Structure formats: structure tokens, C-alpha cells
Amino acid sequence: MELKCRINGEEVVLCAEPTARLRDVLYKAGCHSVRDSDDAEGFAGSDTIIFNGELKYANFILFYQTEGAEIKTAESLLNGRELNYVQKAMVAAGIVQSAYNAPAAALILTWMLEKKPHPTREEIKEVLTSIFIRDAGYEHYYLAVQLATELRDFGEFKSEIAPSFRPHLEVVGKPCGKVDGAALVSGEPVFVEDKVPENAWCLHVLRSPFASAYIKSIDTSEAEKLPGVAAILTAYNTPETHYMQAGQGNPEPSPHDRRLFNMKVRHVGDRVAGIVARTPEIADKAAALIKVEYEPQGAVYTVEEAMAEGAPLVHNGEVIYNAGAPDDLAAFNKLAGDEREGKVVYQFPLGADIHKNIAASNKGGIGDIEKGFAEADAIVESTYQTSQIQHTPLEPHVCYAHIEHGRLVMNCATQVPYHVRRIVSWVCNIPENKIHIIKERVGGGYGSKQDILVEDLTGYAAWVTGKPVYYRNTRAEEFYANSTRHPMRVKVKMGGKKDGTITAIFMEVCANTGPFGNHCLTVPMNSCSKVLPLFAVDNMAYDLKVFYTNTPPAGAYQGYGTPKGTYGIMMTMAELADKLGIDYRTMVEKNHVSEGYMLEILKGLGEGREGNVVPVGSCGLDEAIAKGCDMIEWGKKEVSDDPDWKIGKGFAMIMQGSGLPGLDHAEAIAKLETDGTVILNSGGADLGTGLDTISAKAVKEVLKLPMEKITVVSGDTDSCVFDTGAYASSGTFFSGNASLAAAKNLKEKILQEAALQMDEKVEDLDVRAPGEVYSKVTGNAISYGDLSHAAIAGDGRGQMVAHGSYVTTASSVPYGAHFAQVAVNVKTGEIKVQKFYALQDAGTPINPEIALCQMYGASMKSIGHTLYEDMKLDENGKCINANLTDYGTPMIGEAPDDFKAVLIDVEDAYGPFGAKSISEIACNGAAPAIGIAIHDACGVWMRSWPMTPEKVLKGLGKI
């Protein structure tokens, strides 16, 4: 049908089906700010518009209802290309990060401020209940509103946006807004979905209803007859290449234990067939016509079931080692089962035994653990269990692939463009020079987009059909067909003396990797390697085993194992302090590491090889603990006016890493253009974290150019150079250092060229703002533009281009302490987080406003994991809450009443400008801090996630 309405002040005529969703119509009409994060569930708010003067979800309005309507989208906020006052304030406040629904948030806040020019905190909170923010948390949204009112009323910001650091630097350590902030908050077409042409074919995946079954037969004949079906891909017509989906560098530490399509499905939602069709409707019809005959097999869902005698085996095929094969491999492989099991290929030994469902194992330690326990006055041994958690990025997994000049070109939302290229090359048997990966802006990743979960099949489908192919996960598929956080059982035994000295620690970790071994060794290793080095204890040991099961797959998630290990060890430490009758704070301060302490425990905690033993570098633990204890008034017992509510306090010390020393590698190229501007090509992948801004700031500090004369191009495998990727908190440390190296090397080339053109000595020259070389001796100067123009003249020496590379074995470790005050209702079991304070040492925070928002966002995720989030599986392994509403992601109403993030000022010796990582560590503290606070309030030790009212009441003996 055809109808008239007004969109952003312009009368338009639109044509669509009467029952089409208005969101889809608006998006096709060019309103890219109106996005869909929840498949029309009405949870995320990414589709928010103003409809006849009121905020509405566009997915809830059908096309026929829009006749004569007045519609405004976020595009209406712009004046030409200029942002409105709310959008400017959002960028300044640091909340425009992955930004998939940032335009919707800007529209919501603008609408509110037009109705209520000076809203209260409660009024801001009320209007933001309609939008889900996963990346930046909610706290700085209050600041953004304050900044917006100041800009509107006074023409400038008056409030402090964030503390500033390093006064000798111009932009590093100062809030100045992201270089891509305007594009993101205004709704520019910067995401993968915005690059998909009208003629793209869709890819639909038919998935298994069984948790474990052999495929006996697949009949696709009727489906293939449908007009508009280009191909149906199955295990029968795709490569038998085994590979891993984990986006990790060489040597790959995850087993190659899957194909594009397996002859044995290993979880509900596993791939059975891929349908390339002209439209989603045709694909759905084709899927219904495919006839699959299954042979259901026994399944295991927990580590306890997986390790049981006679348990069904998740993998029971041939095992291959590319290095380090055991002597009994031939005998081992004689026990292999049905040929439909496939293979498991190891690049090196992982301590695996698939005949016991063990995907990986490792053990080690320092000192004499038994001697340490013998010296203890008290010993506590406790077990803590974590749940299966979904990342829930606002942008689901998505990929667009097409053929161009005989090459496979892929637009991806990925953290690891170079790993995507390598793995797609392997799966499709295409040389890497025939693959071009373009990393678009990423609408949230948190580790899930480190894994190659959709790019493998999308790329293959486009390559074999020659069609432009678009694939996008449904929100339900995000839960049952994607990666999740590894559920873990962490058992900690800890001994201590009466004075609080810890004499020994033993950690036993049992992790559930699901049906495939993505990150199966490295995530559980992190639960030890980013936890045990917090302790200055002579006797420590660990024993970890990782089990295959038939649950939805596990993979990388922000924190990467550390939140689970931290939860177990800090809770046990609090239990030990309680048993010894000493103050928990005293025990923490007595036993944590400090600068210079040699971390011998790291020797056994490498990724498949010996780890680097290094001393503790810059460490802000003392200050973080002391300041946090002052803020929360540690030692003061709070009493509620209502006797049913009991109040308690807790905290946890935390650490992470800054990339993987000895494994990670980053590169960048800096080019001086003919007008004196600079383009920096970085291999790094900005996920909304401000990495491109860090790179631009590095160039600014070195070359003294205005920020607007610096452009950063990143994550494009054709135009950029190699970078391991954005994971393991490597962005600032590795990619930032590579950009800094490129800028410094370009400065050297500029000075050398200037010395020739100016007839001066190089050592007499330097650079200064606004972009020129000057002589410290003669006072002569030449602009970068004049210098570059002359260099590329016919008799010049060519364009000045510099390469920067960064590798290191040095370790820059961020530290911190997270504090919680909770109230527990001893009648209902309800838990309220009243206060949450995150104090972190990040070295020099290059983008302090963005750093604070990353701390808020990661802390909110961690609070969600602790109290609300939990993937629930039925008895057949099917996820029964595969949507955002039922899953339990926290919204603004679940945010702590008093929420603060504090940057502890230390300077690191190795990071760019003294910086360390900031975001991932903030996932580690909430569970133990809240758990210890709950015990302080009501005496119950919460031994599993999520910490629910039912568990409180059970602990109190009331149910």
C-alpha cells in the first residue's frame, strides 16, 4: 500500500505491505539510526522514534498505522552535519562507545529535555528505562544530560567531564571526544548492515533440534526446486576441513574439532544446513522442505555428567597432532567410534583426552603446597560455581560477503580481522591475497566477536555461489548458536596463620567448554593466571580440567576466565578471614603483591608453552584498597530503619593483563600527505573502545598536529598491516604502541627530509604546532605541507611513510579493587546493590572519559552476571530463555544507587605514554564484592551465580 506521512519534517510518500514493521520501512527509506537489537521484542530500544510527539518503538508500529503521522528519527537532530547539543554532550561524556543505539539514546534525551529542560535524576532514570545500554553503563548518561543543559544554556560545558592526567601532554590523559563519535551518535551508515545492497541474497541456517545426534541423511531435493534458492549447503557438499572458530593467533591453542557442517550435531542449534536464498521468506520455505533423518545419541550437560564413568562422548573420532603427538596415539585412535564423529586436530598437546570428554588440562605450582597447609592455623576449602552467560551485544553477529574482481570481500563486525582472513582462507581453500576483510564499526563484542562464528559460513556461501550473501543472527541464535562464557566450578583450598598470613593456596578448576574447544585451554588458564599472581604467597598450586559437553558453545568473553577465578579465590579468602577471626581488609593488605615482587607462578601458566616470569611492575593496589575502604567506610556497620533489611559490605582485589606478551604483535603505518596532514593505517580493531582515538592522540603528541588533521584507518586487511586483534586487553598496549612507534618513525623521516630541504643538521631540528619543522639554531621553519609537496616533486625523494611495529615480553598489569554495599531482605531474600565503587589502576588513561565509561559498563555486566543473568537449559539441552527479557540483562533500574568509578594514578614503564588496559579488568570484581557483602549482611555464603533471593532464603534455612 501507499501512504503519506512526515519524516523529519519532510512530507513523503512511502510504499510497503500494510503489516510491514515501521522500523524496516524507515531503515529502507534511509533512516539508518532506527536499528533492531531484539527482533521486535521491545527490550533494547534501538528502534526508538518520536511518533506523533511521543517516544515509540518503531518495531511495534505497522506501516498502515502511519498514514498522516509525524515521525522523527535521530537524523532530525542534525543541522546539516552539525550535531545537536545532546549529541555533542554524549560524545563529550564518553558514552558513545560501540554506539549501536546511541542515536536512539540521543533522540530520547533530546525529547526529554524539550519537555523538561532541567530534569531530576529520577526523571532521567525514568526515560532511560526504555533503552538497554551494555557498553558504557548508565552513570555517565546523567553526566551527559548535565553537560547538554550547560551547552544549551551557557554555550559551553561547565562540569568536569573526567579527571585529567599528565599535564606535560596535550591530549593524552585529557577528555577530548572520540574521533568517530560524531559518525556514531548521528546514525551514519557505519555498521555491516548499512553496507548490504538491495540485491544481496540471504543466508539462513537450519539448526539441530537435538543436543547430540548423527545425521543419517539429508534430503534437500524439494527445497532446491524452489525458485530463488541458489544453494543448500550441508556436510555432504562442503569441505571436510577441520578448523577452530576461536580468533586466536599462532600457534593456535584451540583444537580443530569442527567442520562448516558436521555429520554429528553436538548441541541444540548446531548447524545442519545453510540455505542461500533470494529472500528470508524463500529461505524459510526451503528450510521447511529439507528432510533430515537423525540418530539421537546420549548427551552430557554438566562437567559432573561429562566426567562420570561411562558418560556419552561428545567427540570420539580420530585424533591428530601437528606437533608433540603422544607415543600411544595409534592405540588411542583404535578406540575411535563412528566415522561421522569427524576429527580433532591439535597444533600442540593440550592435556586432552576426548575419551574422557577432557578438552584440555593443565596443572602446576610453586613451593611446597603440603608444607604450606601443614603450617596453617586454619584451612578453608570451598567450591564456587558460575553460570552460562551470554554477551548480548546490541548488534548481533552479522556478515556480508561478495565477490569483487575475483576476490572474496567481506564486511565484518569483528575484533580480529586478520584472524578472520586466515580462518576463512583455511576453510574455503582460498589464498589470503584473494580475501579482503573490512572491519566495520562493531556494535558490541565483549569477546564474542573475537570468534569467527558467522564469517566462515558466510564467506564460503558467497565464494561457492558467486552471490552477494548477507547473514545476521536472530537474537535467539545469539544464545544457542553463538559463544557464551564458560561455566566453571572453582574449588579453592586456602590456609592461613592467626596473624592473617596465607601459607598455601590450591585452585581446582573444572570448566565446561560446550561441544567445541574454542579457547578451551586459555580461558580456564586465565582463571588462575590472572588471579594467583595477586598473592605474595610462597606455596601455590592449580589443577584445571576442561570438559566437552552438549550445551551451547563457550568461547571468549570479557574477563576471559578471570571473573570466575577471582570469585572463587576472594570468597574463600573472606571465609578464611572469618574463620581466623581477623578483619578481611587486613588479610588482603597483608598478602597482596607489590611492585618488584617476582611472579614465579606465571612459569606454568603460558598458553601451551612456558610462561614469562616477570616482576610486578607499576601497581596501584595499595591506593585502590585504601581509597575504596575510605569511600565505603569499611568497618562501619550500617543499620537499616527496616529490621527486615540487613546491610553488608565487601570488596575484592582484581587484576588483568595488557595483551599477551611474547604472543601478540601489532603494526601501523603513518603517511604524511601532500598538504601536511597525516593518515595512520592501524591494524588494530576499534570496538567502540576509543582505540582509533588513542592512535590519533599518539600522532598528535609526536607530530604536534591538530587532531582534525589526523585520520585513522583501521582494521582493513588491504590498506592496513597486521595486528593480532582486539582481545586480551591488547588494544591500548599493543596497537597503541604500534601507532606511537609509527608516529615517531614518521617524525624521524620528516626531520631527515627537512634537514635536506632547509640545509640544516637533523639534530638542530624539531617539530612544533600547528605542524611544522623549525630550527633551534637559525629559527627557520617549514610547514609539513610545503615539506611534503617538495618531497614528492619530480626530483624529490618521495612520500614520507613510516612503519611501526610492537612486540614485547614485558608485562603491564592493571590492578584494582571493587567495593559493594548491599541490602538483603531476610524475609524475601531480595538483594539490592546500594553502592558500588570501582577503583582501578590503568596507568595513564589516554581517554579518561571513555575509560570511566568502560569501567561502568563492565562493572554493570559483572553485576548482571552476579545477580540476574543465567542461560537456562531444559532437560534436552535447549535454551528456554533465549531472549533479552527472560534472560535477565540488567537495565538502569538495576544500577547501584551510588555508583562510582575512580582512576588510580600510576605510570607504567611499557605502555604508550604509561598506559595500561582498563575495560576487561572491570568485569572481575562484582561477584566476590557482592558475595562478601551478602555474607556480611546476613551470614550466607553465596556459592553460585546468579545470587538469587531463593539462594539467600535457602542459606538462611527458610526454604
Language model features by range: what are they?
Residues 271, 278-279, 467-513, 737-766:
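Phosphate/diphosphate-binding loops
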Residues 235-236, 429-434, 464-469, 498, ...:
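C-terminal catalytic domains of large/alpha subunits in multi-subunit enzymes
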Residues 1-161:
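Signature of N-terminal electron-transfer/Fe-S-associated modules in redox systems
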Residues 149-340:
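Flexible, low-hydrophobicity surface segments
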Residues 49, 56, 183, 189, ...:
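Short beta-strand elements
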Residues 422, 441-466, 470-472, 691-698:
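Thiamine diphosphate
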Residues 94, 174, 180-186, 250-251, ...:
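Glycine-rich loop/linker segments at domain edges
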Residues 316-428, 594-677, 697, 880-894, ...:
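Helix-loop-helix junctions that connect adjacent transmembrane helices in secondary transporters/permeases
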